[in-house]
């Protein structure tokens, strides 16, 4: 169902086949919409039909063993949901193959970073850096596949047959996790990093995040899962735990992992590695020297200092920030800003309170709706009526919507027209 703020909500549970069949049947129309938006955007990025055919062939060959890298539980879930997919895109592959490959979309985005498909900024505070001393986590998920793709956000509340109940933010057809929190108060968010191009199929990072969210309740358990999973690409996973009352970043490449704990009672994460273990890594050094990631990390530090101690409302202020270092005006949609007006979603977690605030469109400018996981997972079935808490929602950025939003829409419309001219 769709709540009054425009966020789609799915409650599911049980064994993998049941979960997949339920989501496929309920989200059939949305799954088609997301696949159409994704394919259309890829065609805009790669307009050559000849190169698209080559790309399809390459992905088929490269990912031929991808299914073996996905835990059976999730293969069964994805298979069951894929039975409800459209046949319109069968030229790309059958429904199951397509859905498995789409779970590597975030990973593929690493390879296409020059198209600004993948960004992300996240942070966590606790103790004296939080207004009530409890953990607070904020993140922008800047995975840009066009505004149409981000239009229908989906929050899934899953009570699996095995593991811990959890909430995850994504889109229809996505069994993996991009941003989520479980009933034990553990959160997982993903931030792309730079590494060597993948040479063979491995576990998509979103499915590693799903495994952590479903089966870990502490940082130690999350690290153990990450250490034993070979992944496609390099990634930072910000893990916050209510039981540990702190947050860490797991810095992972296909070959190794490292733990970054930061300093003091806060943690920042953008798109490069910060631990000593990767200080001399050539890909990380190049990333620091040539990308906007260090700039955004510095801006995060400025805002965390100036807005401390943090509240959920102040966390949203950080996620919406469009300025550069020192508060300088660097223009709208600048890659150096935390808010580039490309976010698929923006979310704030309060793990010790079991609360999460999710953005509504456009990007992170709409109001943030609030969910109480303790309330949603309290009984055998979800509560009747609305799942969100209207009294806890945070207001929209009305000034931005009135003044800057129309300018961005017009700018992107004009750019699209120029590209087609």
Where are these regions (language model features)?
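C-terminus-biased signal that marks the final domain/tail of proteins
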Residues: 1-119, 213-257, 262-421
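Internal mixed beta-strand/loop scaffold within catalytic domains of large alpha/beta enzymes
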Residues: 101-208, 224, 344-348, 356-359
